[in-house]
């Protein structure tokens, strides 16, 4: 099986530069002249973007993206993309090329966030059962396990799918296959230490109770599903129910929720690792704005991949 896929070349369902600029101006009430000043371009350049449909150069597009993420509530942008895209779950289930691209990219990025040294090409080789030089066997297991977990996720997730305890444990069992010391499919029996938070994690005795409470609320989305899913992701990571694999399982749960609600999957990329962990740390202090924006950015990357 061939996975002829790049890491960053995602050109599917996106907002145009013109749409992003309009949202920036609406959110900030700045004039075209002020926007030109902030982007360090001429007024005529902004005029061409907005009124003549001229596309910005790559460097200019990056500057526009930066302002867009800084000033615009990305939930609205995600909802707009949702209207443009019919049933991302169906696309992933029915289009093999897009499904393979999703599984490869998601596996590479999610494992890299957790410290894997595998490149995307090496991840592809692992999927194909080919030899991967200069990598530990456990890194190859991690890649294949994550692929299998995503296939299980896509096989089982439906519109309106309900997260259950058994589903979470099964995801962990697949992610930790061949890592018996990590208790695949079972909660941790001791304490764990995290380096990126000062918040005390629940004791192993409290984990089943905390997960039980999590399950009771996880399928109730209210009127703002994006914010709820972002909060749920933080809450799961704050419970940290397993000895290992919490981040990977947590991101798989988030993807399951998003697909079941008609959104594209959230793809947290390795280059956003610091921003991702910072958003979780801020949520420790009760500030959820960053984790919501981070979730939205990752969903938008999912929409890019679907095209």
What is each PLM-predicted segment?
Residues 1-244, 248-307:
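FIC/Doc superfamily catalytic core
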């Amino acid at each position: 099986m061939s996975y002829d896929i790049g890491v960053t070349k995602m050109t599917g369902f996106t907002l145009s530069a013109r749409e992003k600029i309009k949202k920036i101006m609406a959110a900030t009430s700045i004039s075209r002249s002020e926007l030109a000043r902030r982007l360090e371009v001429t007024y005529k350049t902004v005029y061409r973007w907005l009124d003549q449909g001229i596309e910005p150069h790559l460097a200019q597009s990056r500057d526009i993206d930066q302002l867009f993420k800084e000033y615009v509530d990305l939930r609205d942008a995600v909802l707009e993309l949702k209207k443009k895209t019919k049933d991302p779950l169906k696309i992933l289930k029915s289009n093999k090329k897009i499904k393979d691209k999703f599984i490869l990219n998601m596996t590479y990025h999610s494992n890299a966030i957790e410290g894997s040294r595998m490149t995307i090409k090496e991840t592809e080789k692992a999927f194909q059962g080919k030899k991967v030089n200069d990598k530990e066997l456990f890194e190859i297991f991690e890649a294949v396990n994550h692929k299998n977990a995503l296939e299980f996720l896509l096989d089982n997730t439906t519109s309106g799918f309900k997260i259950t305890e058994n589903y979470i444990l099964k995801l962990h069992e697949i992610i930790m296959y061949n890592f018996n010391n990590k208790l695949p499919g079972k909660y941790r029996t001791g304490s764990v230490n995290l380096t990126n938070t000062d918040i005390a994690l629940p004791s192993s005795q409290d984990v089943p109770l905390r997960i039980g409470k999590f399950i009771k609320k996880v399928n109730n989305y209210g009127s703002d599903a994006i914010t709820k899913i972002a909060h749920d992701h933080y809450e799961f990571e704050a419970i940290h129910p397993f000895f290992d694999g919490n981040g990977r399982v947590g991101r798989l749960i988030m993807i399951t929720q998003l697909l079941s609600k008609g959104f594209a999957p959230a793809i947290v990329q390795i280059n956003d690792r610091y921003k991702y962990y910072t958003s979780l740390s801020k949520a420790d202090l009760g500030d959820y704005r960053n984790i919501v924006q981070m979730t939205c950015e990752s969903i938008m990357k999912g929409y890019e991949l679907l095209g």
